[in-house]
Amino acid sequence: METKYLKINPADNVAVAIVTLPAGEKLTVDGTEITLSEEVPAGHKFALKDFAEGENVIKYGYPIGHARTTKKQGDWMNENNIQTNLAGLLDYTYNPTSVTLDIPHKNLTFKGYRRKNGEVGIRNEVWIIPTVGCVNGIINQLAEGLRRETGGKGVDAIMAYPHNYGCSQLGDDHENTKKILRDMVLHPNAGAVLVVGLGCENNQPDVFREFLGEYDEDRVKFMVTQKVGDEYEEGMKLLRELYEKASKDERVDVPLSELRVGLKCGGSDGFSGITANPLLGMFSDFLVAQGGTSLSLIHISEPTRPLYIS
């Protein structure tokens, strides 16, 4: 039988429609037959009981607001009839709960790219990174040129990363740009990187080179467009050298403990808090139990299982 609704927590007094439910639909929830008084769109809530004005609406086991007016069992509960409980200042003390993961450790591996500095990438790409937004045009041309020459084979991707920064930046703003670009240049998913500068920007290529610290000079090349006669030809020459290196990289077995996964916020629809988020939470629990790392971006209104950061 098709599941048409989901009651997330035993304490909830609303349920979520998994598919659009028509008015008059009869559903049995916890042994009680409920008749919907109106159509309830997929992902939206309907009342499991009669609500008095001001009574809390419980979802995920916690109040998500209160009823603006009296509502009947089977009514569609939405932003028009639910009012937030938030008002004024809220006193809050962070009291973390210690949770033990009952997940056995397994000697698992994944196929990754071991870099010279010991870092591990899950992809092997050629990146073109500008020190300043003024060279965005040429880096896009270079990326397209290398894709045409290679047919996109030999590496996972050939990527240009244009941005609008690096020129006339000062202070912390300038330092933050440098830090972000440095982390990109040294990222283990980049098998080779061409850093392209103009020559007159605040983020001077020579200074940025020193800012990088130690790096593999066979895998990171620099080009300053004002110092070359033909920036396209010079850029392609450097990219061919970089591509030659990166295209010979091979995946090797890497302990799962070295895997780092970043979780990105999704569409934030009516289902993400009850489908994707819990699944990613369980995956993160497992990964962390193996010694790996999971970094999560979540909304308070879309809870997952406990997430841990190693």
Which residues are covered by each model-predicted region?
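Active-site glycine- and acidic-residue-rich loops that bind
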Residues: 272-278
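Extended boundary segments
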Residues: 1-37
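Single conserved hydrophobic/aromatic residue that forms the stacking wall/gate
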Residues: 298-310
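Glycine-rich phosphate/diphosphate-binding loops and the adjacent beta-loop-alpha structural elements
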Residues: 124, 264-271
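Short, glycine/charged-enriched hinge/interface segments at domain edges or termini
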Residues: 56-58, 63-127, 141
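Mobile "lid/hinge" segments at catalytic clefts and subdomain interfaces of large enzymes
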Residues: 288-296
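Phosphate-binding glycine-rich loops and their immediate beta-loop-alpha structural context
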Residues: 105-156, 161, 168, 284
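Alpha/propeptide regions of enzymes that mature by internal proteolysis
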Residues: 14, 20-22, 41-44, 50-66, ...
